[in-house]
Amino acid sequence: FLREEALQAARQSIEGVRQVSNIVLAMKEFSHPASKEMGPVDLNRVLERSAVVCKSEWKHVAEIAFELDESLPEVVGLEGALNQVALNMIVNAAHAVADKGTGMGKITVRTKREDDKVRLEISDTGTGIPAHIRDRIFEPFFTTKDVGRGTGQGLALAHDIVVNKHHGQIRVKSTEGEGTTFIITLPIDAQDRKAA
């Protein structure tokens, strides 16, 4: 009996070390992307890594589901900046679910190709965004969060990175009390970026 418990404890320790190793690797890749110049970026990997980095924000309030297009082409972009967009979106989704206060919610992360673009969606079952403020959410310093919890920079930064640095689009669909979906589209290659 003692031998079985020791084996089980060893297995759990190995699994714990593996999880810590994954978190450290994700944080290293997140904070020190390979390049600070435009280059090929795997958005599926960016989204998965960002979810690992901010797991403490969502693990007690929501389940996270990935519906990733495994054949999604890389985009030409700034990996570090796209990491920041993904992180902000997932953290905001977690906060919206937590603010709803109705138990475990859900965050869904999707990717797919649309012609010469890639589309990513981050949906949550949180509070939703009231219609009267939706047109202001990308303004710098605009926040509905309590002092100390939000600066109003996350969505403004995401908008700048997606629209100005990557010539993409960012849109929001939201229903109060039901949740929100942010939809980001990015051109796949540099030629599309220049034409945009």
Can you name each region flagged by the protein language model?
Residues 1-196:
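Core catalytic ATP-binding domain of two-component histidine kinases
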